[in-house]
Amino acid sequence: MHQTSMGIKMESHTLVFISILLCLYGADGNIVMTQSPKSMSMSVGERVTLTCKASENVVTYVSWYQQKPEQSPKLLIYGASNRYTGVPDRFTGSGSATDFTLTISSVQAEDLADYHCGQGYSYPYTFGGGTKLEIK
């Protein structure tokens, strides 16, 4: 079991499965998290900016997760801008209310992954559909 920043205990791949379900079948009234772009291909050393837009004000209750192939999701950023322990300082989160960004200042080969935002402001907690980052 893994503890997320939103206080939910989940099996390793449950977070991604729930993200997909909420994205596809979100109930009326749920906060929708929309990520863009859906995918991008960058060269090592380039600056990357991922965006996440909430359908209503979530203050700064947004987290960012990284999921590498065949691995469980890892928390990168919580509270919109707080870097989780051990996360390299090239990862920076910003934003408030409805508009949020995750920036990778100098992308590295090991950053190949899917990146998801999630909101913990209003139950049920919801997640974006993700951005797939590929390295050229």
UniProtKB/Swiss-Prot annotation:
Residues 86-117 are annotated as: Framework-3. CDD domains: IgV_L_kappa (cd04980). Residues 79-85 are annotated as: Complementarity-determining-2. Pfam families: V-set (PF07686). Gene3D superfamilies: Immunoglobulins. Disulfide bonds: none annotated. Residues 127-136 are annotated as: Framework-4. One of its GO terms (cellular component) is immunoglobulin complex. Residues 30-52 are annotated as: Framework-1. Keywords: Adaptive immunity, Immunity, Immunoglobulin, Signal. Residues 53-63 are annotated as: Complementarity-determining-1. This is Ig kappa chain V-V region MOPC 21. It comes from Mus musculus (Mouse).
